[in-house]
Amino acid sequence: DLAFTWQTGPLVASVVDVVESRGIRTAILDVSFTCHMPDCLEMPYQPRVRNAESLPAEAVKTATREDHVYRLGGNSCLSGDYMGSWKFDHELQVGERIVFEDMIHYTMVKTNMFNGIHHPSIALLHAGGELEVYRTFHYEDYRDRMC
């Protein structure tokens, strides 16, 4: 049997902090490229982010503050848990949602719980706006994978 999917659903993240080092602004998210989107680091593949323009990775090094260009960083302790450059039409704020389009098929198949990183819940957003949560992950899921 052959199966493939496309536009399976987004991975929704939140900005937990914005840091700047050597002129590079990084929005730290509550998801991890290493744990939730490893294909992005392995291929490399830069996912489409809703309401943002994908730029070459080097663009973040030359952007001005007014350009609203950010590197997006994951929440693991791995130093390479970040990706590329995205240009937004505004300054990102803590708590703001970042939507990675068409990522659920990568997120669910290749995911890992490196250092106990929390997994995103699996949910279905119905046409009428109702959010139905199918699965929420907890510490016990991490513990049981290790034992």
Spans of features found by a protein language model:
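Charged (often Lys/Glu-rich) extended helix/loop segments that serve as interaction or gating elements
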Residues: 1-147
